[in-house]
């Protein structure tokens, strides 16, 4: 297990995508759940179910929300 701590997926940005952060660093800009999985894999976390993992805090909507609200 990596020392990333909580992974935060921000609310969808007006320009599209969601920032993914852990340990005070931006891991990347995700445009879907697979992007989040890849960022976690690169950070040393394999086989994380991004839809149910308690390691991930979804802000502004869950893993099925990728467009900004009205």
Language model regions located:
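A short, charged, amphipathic alpha-helix used as a generic interaction element across diverse proteins
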Residues: 31-44
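A generic structural micro-environment signature
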Residues: 7, 15, 33, 51, ...
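Mixed-charge, Lys/Arg-enriched low-complexity segments
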Residues: 42-70
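N-terminal acidic leader/helix
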Residues: 4-26
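N-terminal domain-start interaction segment
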Residues: 1
């Amino acid at each position: 297990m990596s020392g990333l701590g909580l992974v935060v997926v921000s609310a969808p940005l007006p320009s599209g995508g969601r920032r993914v952060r852990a340990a005070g660093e931006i891991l990347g800009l995700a445009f879907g759940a697979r992007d989040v999985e890849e960022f976690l894999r690169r950070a040393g976390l394999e086989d994380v179910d991004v839809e149910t993992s308690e390691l991930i805090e979804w802000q502004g909507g869950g893993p099925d929300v990728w467009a900004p609200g009205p």
